[in-house]
Swiss-Prot record:
Residue list for modification S-(dipyrrolylmethanemethyl)cysteine: C241
PROSITE patterns in UniProt: PORPHOBILINOGEN_DEAM
Keyword Transmembrane helix recorded: no
GO CC entries: cytoplasm
Protein name in the entry: Porphobilinogen deaminase
Keyword Zinc annotated: no
Similarity annotation: Belongs to the HMBS family.
EC assignment: 2.5.1.61
Chain's gene name: hemC
Additional observations: The porphobilinogen subunits are added to the dipyrromethane group.
Length: 313
């Protein structure tokens, strides 16, 4: 039986928190198991002076971790589900989806309570095209500026006056014990989250049955059902993690209620739709919702985004 588990992780405080959380859970579940972290930098961590959407490509934050597993330098990788591409390299798979933290976006400001309170010309920071398109659609009088860096860097930029407000994933702030910085949670009706937002996923080698057995107790079936529906929608749209796509699934009894959107980054056009159906068919529902959005014109919006990405890269 495996006595040692090596976790590949990014070096940011949030990534390390996530890896340490899984380390702690594994050690609690399997006394005597040695779990160590293997921190490394990814392309998305290194290129900090360019908007994420312009770096382009899928898996900006995961490729180096996957190479480490394939080369045998690490056994598993812990990811934010929203950063994880929908396809995996041969030999690797997403095995475990852990219990979800709050999936909503957080509004953070030192002077205003929520988006509705921001005056004309107020500057809002976000690196997400998904957040940008929803804010610009509903609040065209606001100025959206790109915001990169880790959570602490983003908060510092707000505190130094570069922005009137910033929008971050609530889950990251809560996990870093910075929940007191959340001025308000943005309702999903106002800012539909990214697929998988707030959930952690564990990737491992496809043929590593011992590792899968160790990870099995960390699986959260409810979160898995919801996130698989969201990811299936993203896959149907051929979306990466840096695209203006929102997907949010809720479980209502044994039914899934899935909402999705695709929008132009400037908020000029935002497509929305929703589906309901049995939880046992979560992924089919996600694919169905993608089809409905494509019929509304999602492909044209996304190809324009990809074209502008490639012209900047």
């Amino acid at each position: 039986m495996t006595q040692r588990v090596r976790i590949a992780t990014r070096k940011s405080k949030l990534a390390l928190w996530q890896a340490e959380h899984i380390q702690q859970r594994l050690e609690e579940l399997h006394p005597g198991l040695s779990v160590e972290l293997v921190p490394m930098s990814t392309k998305g961590d290194v290129i900090l002076d360019t908007p994420l959407a312009k770096i382009g490509g899928k898996g900006l934050f995961v490729k180096e971790l996957e190479v480490a597993m394939l080369e045998g330098r690490a056994d598993i990788a812990v990811h934010s589900m929203k950063d994880l591409p929908v396809e995996f390299p041969p030999g690797l798979e997403l095995h475990t989806i852990c219990e979800r933290e709050d999936p909503r976006d957080a509004f953070v400001s030192n002077n205003y309570k929520n988006l509705n309170e921001l005056p004309e010309g107020a500057v809002v920071g976000t690196c997400s095209l998904r957040r940008r398109c929803q804010v610009k659609e509903q609040f065209p009088h606001l100025v959206i500026k790109d915001l990169r860096g880790n959570v602490q860097t983003r908060l510092r930029k707000l505190d130094e006056g570069e922005f009137d407000a910033i929008i971050l994933a609530a889950s990251g702030l809560i996990r870093l014990e910075l929940g007191d910085r959340i001025t308000s949670f943005i309702p999903v009706e106002q800012s539909l989250p990214a697929n998988g937002q707030g959930a952690l996923g564990i990737e491992c080698r496809s043929d590593d049955d011992e590792m899968k057995a160790l990870l099995a107790p960390l699986q959260c079936q409810e979160t898995r059902t919801r996130v698989l529906a969201e990811r299936a929608m993203n896959r149907g749209l051929d979306g990466g993690c840096q695209v203006p796509i929102g997907a949010y699934a809720e479980l209502e009894g044994d039914e899934v209620y899935l909402r999705g959107l695709v929008g132009e980054p400037d908020g000029g056009k935002v497509l929305r739709d929703e589906v309901r159906g049995p939880a046992s068919k979560a992924e089919e529902l996600g694919s169905e919702l993608a089809e409905r959005l494509l019929k509304q014109g999602a492909a044209e919006i996304l190809s324009a985004v990809y074209d502008s990405e490639s012209s900047h890269s």
